[in-house]
Design a protein with these regions (language model features):
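C-terminal catalytic domains of large/alpha subunits in multi-subunit enzymes
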Residues: 1-175
Length: 175
């Protein structure tokens, strides 16, 4: 723990470059990592602590189908919000103790405004019309962004999912 405490307040920057072989290279066991996406999300809470807006910026290469990428980002954000705030799937000896009806999926009335931001570079990759793809990456940054929003809102650091002492956890106890 002391090592982690020493890192408090520092910023870290990292660039990931995986060696890759040229597409179609005649080499044994070629490495074909051709592209990587990037995503970052910012969550805005209202005065009650309810998520009112999510800004989701994604570098997914060239946007080929805007409707599909919008849907993928919105679905990923909602899935990440569920993990962060409302969904609980307790297990006992590996057996689920909840049913889908009691899982805590978001209600349609609880869906915040989601702003999808497409980051497209002038220089496109020489594959598949410059597209990188969008998928699970839309879910990954959401829960940390929700935790960061709550930490900024009330100063409490929550370390487990679903997050406790939120607008949503308090509402669950009332319903």
């Amino acid at each position: 723990m002391a090592a982690l405490a020493a890192l408090e307040g520092h910023e870290f920057y990292y660039e990931y470059l995986e060696p890759t072989d040229k597409l179609g290279a005649d080499v044994p066991n070629p490495k074909s990592h051709i592209c990587y996406g990037f995503a970052t999300h910012v969550v805005i809470l209202d005065d009650e602590g309810k998520v009112s807006e999510v800004y989701a910026a994604h570098d997914s290469g060239r946007v080929i189908n805007p409707i599909a990428i919008q849907g993928q980002i919105e679905g990923g954000v909602l899935m990440g919000m569920g993990y962060a705030l409302t969904e609980d799937w307790p297990l006992k000896d590996g057996v689920p103790q909840a049913k889908y009806g009691t899982l805590g999926l978001f209600r349609a009335t609880d869906i915040p405004q989601i702003h999808a931001i497409y980051v497209e570079k002038d220089e496109q990759l020489p594959v598949a019309y410059g597209g990188k793809g969008i998928g699970e990456i839309a879910t990954i940054p959401t829960a940390p962004a929700v935790q960061n929003a709550y930490h900024a809102w009330d100063g409490k650091l929550r370390r487990s999912l679903p997050l406790s002492d939120t607008y949503y956890s308090r509402r669950a106890h009332r319903d």
